[in-house]
Amino acid sequence: MTDKEKRLERQSRIRNFSIIAHIDHGKSTLADRILEKTSAITQREMKEQLLDSMDLERERGITIKLNSVQLKYKAKDGEEYIFHLIDTPGHVDFTYEVSRSLAACEGAILVVDAAQGIEAQTLANVYLALDNDLEILPVINKIDLPSAEPERVRQEVEDVIGLDASEAVLASAKAGIGIEEILEQIVEKVPAPTGDPEAPLKALIFDSLYDAYRGVVAYIRVVEGTVKPGQKIKMMATGKEFEVTEVGVFTPKATPTNELTVGDVGFLTASIKNVGDTRVGDTITSAANPAEEALPGYRKLNPMVYCGLYPIDTAKYNDLREALEKLELNDSSLQYEAETSQALGFGFRCGFLGMLHMEIIQERIEREFNIDLITTAPSVIYDVYMTDGEKVVVDNPSNMPDPQKIERVEEPYVKATMMVPNDYVGAVMELCQGKRGNFIDMQYLDANRVSIIYDMPLAEIVYEFFDQLKSSTKGYASFDYELIGYKPSKLVKMDIMLNGEKIDALSFIVHRDYAYERGKVIVEKLKELIPRQQFEVPVQAAIGQKIVARSTIKAMRKNVLAKCYGGDISRKRKLLEKQKEGKRRMKQVGSVEVPQEAFMAVLKMDDSPKKQ
């Protein structure tokens, strides 16, 4: 057999697939079982959620980063097949990670919980898989639960998604039931990769990470051609050229191989020192015989939420920059730029896909890079149209132009889809109305599950909406949102003043109808959180020049009369006058320290008034 025939024969036995599911429907457990079944790992190495390598992932029990692993499986037809399993996250903020994983596959296993049925996220991920023309294999998981209703869920998959579920495997990843059927279905139904191993090299970078010894490690899926160590490669987006030092696959440990050819999913190192040279979604081709055109990469993701990150110790500003550079390498949806604040010093304005993404990045910086952070209130991007016809894009409330010059302000709206049990429909609708939502549609999926659709301002969803939705439905609701565009709203910027000075990091943008109540709540909260000073401190909320709410932090009092026993009233009065004068002078020059809790208070408006 020639090299080419060998490669083509091997190619016909490759199956690339990923597992998609809503959070907690069991995809990491299923991945564990598949690894055991194909004996990719010994019992000794087995631990729960094997592919979730980040500590954070294991603690929270969620998958954040995608991971890939190569498995060998001896099927019933006697052939040995090569599987590439690419693990994907299930949370709404990480949809991008999912779309990257799916671009590297030909098939997807759709895991649906036999007790809970289809959730909002399941749908979102299925549509992504259909966009990528993948073969979808439905699997109904957790059939060993007492509350499992596999037949109802099978019907739901057919009705809601429109997939043929007659051959859906009934499985329990935990108990190891049905795993073999799943593997056999992968062999039969998932198509082998197409592509010519002799053609010019084309490989898609779907992830990358930085290794202190080897430089950048790129995770690639070879679409056409072959790549070997010693070969010169070129990045199509940047035009940079490198020499490959090592290629290999994950079994789950990184294992070097002689070459990667069509359909292989593995890694490549080429002494790439600069983090920016390997963009995720870029195409690698050979320098000597480059491909004509790049693979369709990923769409560049735009952040939805911005917030300021500042190191508590200002000397760590450069460490924070390095941390962000390294995180940006394998999380291309993170964006950041330097900014300064009078209250907090030097820091960065960072863009995230959503609140969970923001929390995860914050935690990763604090853990992996050991930098303590202060974060400012998250805000979305507003389009501000000026009276002179100019349009200004505002992602930081303190950059809001002067209200006199503003003609209108537009804010991003999202279409929010919530799947809720029947009993909680009223509570959810009330919550959405309170968040300035517009009711669009409501459908009954079956006797006790309802899908509710609202158009809502992204700014209202950004903070705590998900938590409030969960608590108003006892944790049963699931939620997914997509951006639909910008709409004009009556928005104003609210400044918080301490002792007559504006604190730039506490400013936020609010709807005019809610401004008074929001101002009142914040002023009261700050009054509790800011420590008392030697002098009286007024806390005010202002819109432009107009003060809408005020409260006063009382001064601490020293008893200056303690040393006067009895004595003349004029003597006492003199001491009190002197104290009063001292306090007045102090008030003119005194500055007030704002604790971190005060910044968080502006965000946590959970007791903000509901608009009737």
Swiss-Prot record:
Identification of the protein by name: Elongation factor 4
Family matches, as InterPro entries: EF-4, EFG_III/V, EFG_V-like, EFTu-like_2, G_TR_CS, LepA_C_sf, LepA_CTD, LepA_IV
Major subcellular site: membrane
GO BP: any one term: positive regulation of translation
Keywords: Cell membrane, GTP-binding, Hydrolase, Membrane, Nucleotide-binding, Protein biosynthesis
Purpose of the protein: Required for accurate and efficient protein synthesis under certain stress conditions. May act as a fidelity factor of the translation reaction, by catalyzing a one-codon backward translocation of tRNAs on improperly translocated ribosomes. Back-translocation proceeds from a post-translocation (POST) complex to a pre-translocation (PRE) complex, thus giving elongation factor G a second chance to translocate the tRNAs correctly. Binds to ribosomes in a GTP-dependent manner.
Family matches, as NCBIfam families: lepA, small_GTP
Localization per Swiss-Prot or TrEMBL: Cell membrane
Species: Bacillus subtilis (strain 168)
GO molecular function: GTP binding; GTPase activity; ribosome binding; translation elongation factor activity
